[in-house]
């Protein structure tokens, strides 16, 4: 950050891989976590920007243990836990049947990422993957994600950071 006097201020460093790195991995076929571990262990990576090609479209949703209307945390035990699968479907999770979702920590249960050649195909694949996902025992954001994926403004890419405020009637 640079102020009106020309002085610079340091805001933050994220010495970690961002949660969204999975989208980059899906469209490039590059394992960023593996590369990070190799760099941290002193290995020289000979990968160049020109070696990385973008292919297709990926979408990630966070499957949080939250009420889909109020977004309030939903702690509890997962009585049933079934994750989707198939080509172009990735699930990154720590949750399992019997997992106790605590009330005092991050509500993330899993990241669901899909890849397909086009955005429309990715949306269709994500809708199918969400309908295949079964998480019983806590509320989740699955109904909200399903509503967003079917909503016209989202499908037409007419979205801003105010999307949820502007679409309070999704659920």
Model-derived features with residue positions:
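ATP-dependent carboxylate activation and anion-phosphoryl transfer catalytic cores
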Residues: 1-171
């Amino acid at each position: 950050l640079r102020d009106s006097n020309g002085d610079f201020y340091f805001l933050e460093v994220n010495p970690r891989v961002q949660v969204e790195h999975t989208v980059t991995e899906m469209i490039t076929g590059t394992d960023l976590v593996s590369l990070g571990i190799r760099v941290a262990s002193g290995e020289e990576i000979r990968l160049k920007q020109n070696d990385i090609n973008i292919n297709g479209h990926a979408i990630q949703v966070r499957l949080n243990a939250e009420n889909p209307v109020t977004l309030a945390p939903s702690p509890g035990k997962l009585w049933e836990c079934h994750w989707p699968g198939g080509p172009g479907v990735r699930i990154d999770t720590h949750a399992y049947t019997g997992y106790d979702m605590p009330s005092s920590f991050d509500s993330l249960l899993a990241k669901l990422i899909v890849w397909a050649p086009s955005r429309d195909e990715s949306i269709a694949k994500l809708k199918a993957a969400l309908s295949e996902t079964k998480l019983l025992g806590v509320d989740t954001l699955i109904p909200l994600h399903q509503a967003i994926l079917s909503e016209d403004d989202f499908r037409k890419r007419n979205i801003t950071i105010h999307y949820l405020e502007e679409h309070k009637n999704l659920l």
